Amino acid sequence: MEVKLDFSSEDFSNYSYNYSGDIYYGDVAPCVVNFLISESALAFIYVLMFLCNAIGNSLVLRTFLKYRAQAQSFDYLMMGFCLNSLFLAGYLLMRLLRMFEIFMNTELCKLEAFFLNLSIYWSPFILVFISVLRCLLIFCATRLWVKKTLIGQVFLCCSFVLACFGALPHVMVTSYYEPSSCIEEDGVLTEQLRTKLNTFHTWYSFAGPLFITVICYSMSCYKLFKTKLSKRAEVVTIITMTTLLFIVFCIPYYIMESIDTLLRVGVIEETCAKRSAIVYGIQCTYMLLVLYYCMLPLMFAMFGSLFRQRMAAWCKTICHC
């Protein structure tokens, strides 16, 4: 590329810059990346997800609170999924308020960032503790302490604390900018900040939990096939469904985020075409991730005995009517 600048000594007299000539940059121009979905379509999707989230999770949470005396350890972790998805509903509501420029400031931006990142970090850790609990129930089936509901309560609290720790860095660097932007920024170091946050997010909420979950489920499957448990087929089905749902809905987003990190640190050469493809990929896979967290309690509540029994009773009542 050849850049032609027509300067003369008069342009720099008294340390001033008075250039008015033409600059030819050839085919060089800033990358313009448009959003894949329009603002109106995005608002409609957010409203739809908010309604599905609020109605579905309210049903599951109501069932848990009404029949809490019959709850088991897994049911407490199912309730954690409900609370997590309700935090996501709070984020969707605040995102809609920001799109219409209603009641936004830095404090509300930080609250929005907390709701979003808490919901993203909390679900993987709940899945980790579900796999740990499943492993304990298989390996320590004869121990009474494993079957106590206190285990589920402790695991739920631990997962919440770990999720808050993951969300905190995002909240600290989020600021509000007119007219309606909540941005993670650190002045001239914003690019390095986002690279670090992406790396932390990938390892803390994806690679680490996935590694622990795979180990626990592998040990559980090995133990199941070595013994003759009466519910072996049911447990294997639950483990398979849990893994498949995570692979289909979550892994694509983390793959795109990892590619974006590699692009930012220079491992992959950046071009406008690559940048556009990554942005579009992140937008699509992010929608899948949000949909997964919205529907997660309904899908996983079917594995919990409390909700499954109540649903069966309601269906029988409806059929008799």
Curated annotation (Swiss-Prot):
May be highly relevant to the process of cellular transformation and rapid T-cell proliferation effected by HVS during latent infections of T-cells in susceptible hosts. It is a multi-pass membrane protein. It is found in: Host cell membrane. This is G-protein coupled receptor homolog ECRF3. Residues 52-76, 142-149, 216-234, 304-321 are cytoplasmic. Residues 1-34, 94-124, 167-196, 252-286 are extracellular. InterPro entries: CCR1-9-like (IPR050119), GPCR_Rhodpsn (IPR000276), GPCR_Rhodpsn_7TM (IPR017452). Keywords: G-protein coupled receptor, Glycoprotein, Host cell membrane, Host membrane, Membrane, Receptor, Transducer, Transmembrane, Transmembrane helix. Glycans are attached at residues 14, 18, 117. The lineage of its organism: Viruses, Duplodnaviria, Heunggongvirae, Peploviricota, Herviviricetes. One of its GO terms (molecular function) is C-C chemokine binding. The gene is 74. The keyword Ubl conjugation does not apply. SUPFAM superfamilies: Family A G protein-coupled receptor-like. The chain crosses the membrane at residues 35-51, 77-93, 125-141, 150-166, 197-215, 235-251, 287-303. One of its GO terms (cellular component) is membrane. Belongs to the G-protein coupled receptor 1 family.
